From Swiss-Prot:
Origin species: Parasynechococcus marenigrum (strain WH8102)
Catalytic residues identified in the record: 93 (proton donor)
Pathway: Cofactor biosynthesis; riboflavin biosynthesis; riboflavin from 2-hydroxy-3-oxobutyl phosphate and 5-amino-6-(D-ribitylamino)uracil: step 1/2
GO biological process, one term: riboflavin biosynthetic process
Enzyme class: transferase
Binding site for (2S)-2-hydroxy-3-oxobutyl phosphate: 90-91, 132
GO cellular component: cytosol; riboflavin synthase complex
EC number: 2.5.1.78
InterPro entries xref list: LS, LS/RS, LS/RS_sf
NCBIfam families: lumazine-synth
The protein's name in its UniProt record: 6,7-dimethyl-8-ribityllumazine synthase
This protein's UniProt keywords: Riboflavin biosynthesis, Transferase
Pfam entry (one): DMRL_synthase
């Protein structure tokens, strides 16, 4: 029996794209900071001149899938991370955006064969979003870690 697992130290050949929603950027910028901190601490060059990392900003979480698809299909990246924050309001808009973003991101991963990390917070309040983006913990770090694991796992599967 063969066991396949991603390793968090196999980062030398990893190229990652991060797509960040500008809407609720008070939250998403903190998620991005946590994500970049994780990637940097695990050996990914996160400098502005990095050849391992690119960041694309989109207007909101609804736009994440199309840009993630473009990046995943480019052949330049082993992993794409999507970061967004959708906070419930008084209208059904929340449900529409969350459903379409999650379905779209999952479809990109399935159709491209490139792991796409779903880093979209879905919360009832801004306070809950901020707690998940740095006040209590920063899920951006977790999304970075997921990307490293999936990139390494996909490389291991390709070599088997």
């Amino acid at each position: 029996m063969t066991t396949f697992e991603g390793r968090f130290t196999d980062t030398a050949d990893l190229r990652i794209a991060v797509v960040v929603a500008r809407f609720n950027d008070l939250v998403t910028s903190k998620l991005l900071s946590g994500c970049l901190d994780c990637l940097s601490r695990h050996g990914i060059d996160t400098a502005e001149t990095s050849s391992q990392l690119d960041v694309a900003w989109v207007p909101g979480s609804f736009e994440l899938p199309i840009v993630a698809q473009n990046l995943a299909q480019s052949g330049r990246y082993q992993v794409v991370i999507t970061l967004g924050a959708v906070i419930r309001g008084d209208t059904p808009h929340f449900d529409v955006v969350v459903a379409e973003a999650s379905k779209g991101i999952a479809t990109v991963a399935r159709e491209s064969g490139v792991p796409v990390i779903f880093g979209v917070l879905t919360t009832d309040t801004m306070q809950q979003a901020l707690e998940r983006a740095g006040i209590k913990s920063n899920l951006g770090w977790s999304y970075g870690l997921q990307a490293l694991e999936m990139g390494s796992l996909m490389a291991a599967l390709a070599q088997s």
